């Protein structure tokens, strides 16, 4: 290990670059691709004490492993499979053949160094749109500005907004899927040879969720075909590389296969979504202590996101999963972004989303707190859909006039007070997740003494 490299602290995750059989009794053997966790630095900086997935500890050589890093979404061109770099106008037109309306790529501008060009196939022709770079922002029409190319492409994928067509299908750069390099560099790329796909456990709009086996461990695998939605899932995986908490579903790694698509591999949550878990068991099986534990599990995950300046934006019982040992973990980070960013509100679940987020696209930890209040209501109603007997179109007008749902049957008054505190129309008066956790822990302590 180089003398200038700082020692890795305890808890650092590493991925093995080579096989290590060990030469002494205290060594920890491992195979290329294994994930190891640093336990302590040794006196010799070239060696660490580490543990493997099953908790066995031993000494490992530092130069055989690579530290896992968080992938920063939105800053790396390598996460954009439609970006082709320095190619000419003529090369772009050849790549967009045979013609297919909505097929597109982005290249560096040959006429305007520093700018980009969006090339789009439409009605048998290829249109070239200059993307101007000015004052650290990007724009095609000098009306709408974007922080980066990903945001720009995301916008025109959902709306043509003056272009000849909406962007439908990216022309993936030949020979490589750029994201692969980035996940490999940061230690999150897994090998397809080590993954067995067993059975479909869920179907979504963008692909399937499958039960898999990765090196003898059960895993869940999101399988996404390479299309215009792949970028959103790469962004989700990028967010997950930056987050680590016992109540967040853990990313194990990413596989990018040019022909077969994108695979996001996470820990397997045997008991499925919290909403289904609650509905299938109900009041006769689940006691108040169990409901309070699930509430605290989710609250602790959200307190962690709050502390790391992430906003989930889609918190609901359907996006919380339950493990074999009944631990609730927050999942589905598809909309999760750093707290400063905004978002199109077209696809947001109205009944779970804070009024200011629907009205003004103002997302913050406090809008997540509103959603947490709805999730608490779901937990204590054993998975009922919120705002029962109110037509969807009437929910927002009634909420904005101050309407709050009644307490679910049998819900402790103290828990209902927590829900109502989450539903203040003034976001600033809602509690933080730290305060919510403290309130729920006080309720738990009080119940233990009853």
Curated annotation (Swiss-Prot):
SMART domains, per this entry?
SH2 (SM00252), SH3 (SM00326), TyrKc (SM00219)
Q: Which residues form the Protein kinase domain?
A: 195-449
* Superkingdom field: Eukaryota
Q: Name one GO biological process term.
A: adherens junction organization
What domain comment accompanies this record? The architecture of this protein is similar to that of Src-family kinases (SFKs) with one N-terminal SH3 domain, one SH2 domain, and a C-terminal kinase domain.
What does this protein do, in the record's words? Non-receptor tyrosine-protein kinase that plays an important role in the regulation of cell growth, differentiation, migration and immune response. Phosphorylates tyrosine residues located in the C-terminal tails of Src-family kinases (SFKs) including LCK, SRC, HCK, FYN, LYN, CSK or YES1. Upon tail phosphorylation, Src-family members engage in intramolecular interactions between the phosphotyrosine tail and the SH2 domain that result in an inactive conformation.
Protein name from the UniProt record: Tyrosine-protein kinase CSK
Q: Name the encoding gene, please.
A: CSK
